[in-house]
Amino acid sequence: MQERYDFKAIEAKWQKKWEELKLYEVDDFSEKPKYYCLEMFPYPSGKLHMGHVRNYSIGDVVARYKRMRGYAVLHPMGWDAFGLPAENAAIKHGNVHPADWTWDNIANMRRQLKELGISYDWRREIATCHPEYYRWTQWLFLQFYKKGLAYKKKAPVNWCPGCQTVLANEQVIDGECERCHSRVEKKELEQWFFKITAYAERLLQDIKKLTGWPEKVKIMQENWIGRSEGAEITFKIKGHEETISVFTTRPDTIFGVTYMVLAPEHPLVEKISRGTQYEKDVLEFKRKMMYLSEIERTAETAEKEGVFTGAYAINPFTGEEIPILLANYVLVEYGTGAVMGVPAHDQRDFLFAKKYNLPIKVVITPPGQELKAEELTEAYTGEGILVNSGEFTGLANKEAIRIITQEAEKRGFGKYRVNYRLRDWLISRQRYWGAPIPVLYCEKCGIVPVPEDQLPVVLPYNVEFRPTGESPLKYVPEFLNATCPECGGPATRETDTMDTFICSSWYYYRYTSPRDKQQPWSKEKVERWLPVDQYIGGVEHAILHLLYSRFFTKVLYDLGLVHVDEPFTNLLTQGMVLKDGAKMSKSKGNVVSPEEIVEKYGADTARLFILFAAPPERDLEWSDQGVEGSFRFLNRVWRLIYQTKDRISDELREFSAKDKELNRLLHATIKKVTEDIEERFNFNTAISAIMELVNGLYQYKEGEINPGLLKEALNKLVILLAPFAPHIAEELWEALGNKQSVHLEKWPEYDEEALITEEVEIVIQVNGKVKDRVMVPRNAAEDELKEIALNTPKIKELTADKKIIKVIIVPEKLINIVVAG
C-alpha cells in the first residue's frame, strides 16, 4: 500500500477488475431474494451532468447495499435514445446523422458511467433507437391497436412552430414548448392517439396502492387525471335538428342558465352560425383562437372574450331560449366543449355576463338571506337553498344536485356522468428520429397494421431532416411505398414516428430479457424481477413518464403479458443540483463538469460529495469547498489505514474501558448507517456517522490498542464506506489483507448489547432547577446516587447550611434535591 492516495490508479485498477470478475452481473434465477433497483435512463446528450451523477450515485448506494444484504440485485442501464435533440444537432451541424450522433454520445456517456464506478450489469444495456428494441415498441403498438386503444382522428393539436411538430398536452408548459420554449399554436391534423382515458379511473383509484411514492407525486397525478362528478344535460338548438350536450358539476343551477358558450373548435360552430349576420365575426373569432395557447385562453387573469353565434339553445327544464356564444375560456378537449353559463353562481360566467350584458338570474341563496341579481358584485358560489327553480325550489342545493340529475335522466335529456381532465395521449410526431408507427394505408383496405412478422419497420438512413411540418419520411420513396399485406395492392407507410415517451413506458421490462429475439420479454424473467423495487428519478417526470408507465403496465396486465398492474413499488424523486442558487445550465454559465471533478479529485470524491451535501429529495447547492472536504476525508481514511494496518491481528484481548468505548462507537455507527440507508435514504447522515467513526479510530490508535478489535473496526469501517466510495474501499480492503472483493462481503450486523454504555449522564437539580450534570454507573443503587449527588463540589456548596427535605430520584435521568431556606 502506498502512502499517498493515488485515486487515478486505484479507480482504473478496480474498474478493470470488476469487469474481469463480472462482479455486477446478476443471475436471473439465483436462489437469493430479488431486488430490482432502477434509475431513470438518460437521453444520450453526449455528456453526463451533475444531475445524472446524483441520480446514479443514489441508485448505486442502494444497489451495492442490497447486494451486501444478500439480495440478487438487478441494476441495469440503457439509453432513451430517440428524440428531437439528435435531429436538431443534425440540422445545426449539417454533416452529422442523428444515428451517428446518438451512438457516439452513448459511447461517451457509457465510458463516463464506468469511470464513476456505478455497479451496472452492462450485459443488459439497451438503446431505444436500436431496431431490436423498437421492433418491440412497434409490436406493443399493434397490441394496443388490436385492443382498440390506438386510434387515428382529426383533432386540434398543440403545434410547436420551433420544433415543427405536434406536442402532447403534457409537453406544453405555460403555453410554451417544454423543449424550445416557442409559443404553442393550435392546428387541426390527423393524428394517432392512445386511449389512456379508458384507464383514467383505474389510474386514479390505484394511486392508493402506491404507498412507497412521495405524496406530492401522487397529488400531481390525481390533479392531472382530474376526476369530477356531475351531469351531462342535452339542450336542443332552436331551428336545428342537432343538440348540444354540456357537462356540469352543478346541475342544481340549471334554472339559472342564461346563456351557453361553445369552444371555438366545437364541431357545430360553423353550422349554427351559417347564414346569420354574425357568421363573419364567428369565423374571425375562431381563426384568432387558433393562435392562442390553452394557458393564454384559460388563465384566471386572461380577459374573457366571446362572440354571439346568432343561434339559441333551449333550456330543457324551463323551455327558455338562451343565446349561444363562443368564448375563449372554453376548450373543446375538456368535457363536451360546451358550457352552460350561470353568472349568478360561477365567477367566470359572472365576469363574462357583465362584459357582454347577459342576464343574471339568482337560483341559490344562503339560508335565511335574499340575493338580488342587480345587487351582486360577484357570483355567489356557496351552499344554500334553491329559489326560482320550479318544483325544486326550497331544496338544499347539495340534495338538488342528485334530484335534478335523476329528473333529467327520467325525462330523457340528461344523465349522471364522471368527467376527467385527462385527455387521450397524442403519440404522432412529424419528425424522423423516432420509432416508425407500424401502419400502412391502402386505398382498398384502409388502415392496415403491419404484420408482426414484418417488424421492425426500420428507419431509413438516407433522409433529409430539415423540418417542414411534415415527416421527413414522406420524402423517402423506398420507405414510403409498400405492398398491402391484405390485398397485395400498393400501399403507403405511415410517416409519422412515435412519441419517445412510448419507448420509455416499457423499457424496465426489456432489461429482464434484453437480447430476446422471440418476444419483448420472457414472462418467466418478468415474474422473477418485476415490479421494480426502487425507482429513482427527477420529480419533473411525475406526470408524463410515470403516468404513461402506469398506463402501459395496466394495459399489459389486461393483455396477460405481465403479472403486475403497477410497475414501481417505491419511488424516490431526487432534488436538483444548483450552483449559486440556480439550476446548472449553459445559459447561466454555472455548469460544473463531472469529468473535471473526476479528473481532479476522483470518482469516489464526486460521489461522496454529492451524497453528503444534502438528503436525496432536497435540492443540493454545489460547493467547491464541499468537494475539497470530501477529498480530504477520503485521504484521512487512507492515512488511518496506512498508519494502522501493521498493528492489527486476530488477537482479541479482554476489553479495556477504551476498547469498550470504541466497540460501542463501532456498533452505533453500523446501526446508524444501516437505518439511514434502509429506512430513510439519509445518505448524508450515514456518511456523517462514518466520519465520526474515523475520528474515534484516530483517537483510539494513539497509545495501547487491542489488535483484534482494531482489525474488526477497520474492516467494518471499509465495508460501511463501500457503497458510497467503492474504489477506495476495494483498495483499503485489499490492504487490510482480505482476498475477495469488499462488495461481495456481508453487511455487518450491530450488537444491541454493545450499544449499552456502562455510565449514563444524569441531571442534578436543586428545587427543580438544573445545577449540575454528572456521569454515574448505569445500574447504581439509589443510596449510591444520592451520595454521588450530594458530594459533587457544586451541590455541596449550594446545599451547605440548608436543610435537605427530600431527594427525588428518576433512574438514569435526574436527581432533584429539595431544600428549605
Swiss-Prot record:
A biological process (GO) of this protein is:
leucyl-tRNA aminoacylation
Subcellular location, in the record's words?
A: Cytoplasm
The record ties this protein, via PROSITE patterns, to:
AA_TRNA_LIGASE_I
What's its EC? 6.1.1.4
SUPFAM superfamilies xref list: Anticodon-binding domain of a subclass of class I aminoacyl-tRNA synthetases, Nucleotidylyl transferase, ValRS/IleRS/LeuRS editing domain
Reactions this protein catalyses: tRNA(Leu) + L-leucine + ATP = L-leucyl-tRNA(Leu) + AMP + diphosphate
Among the GO molecular function terms of this UniProt record, one is: ATP binding
Q: What family is this protein classified in?
A: Belongs to the class-I aminoacyl-tRNA synthetase family.
According to UniProt, the name of this protein is Leucine--tRNA ligase
| Natural source organism | Carboxydothermus hydrogenoformans (strain ATCC BAA-161 / DSM 6008 / Z-2901)
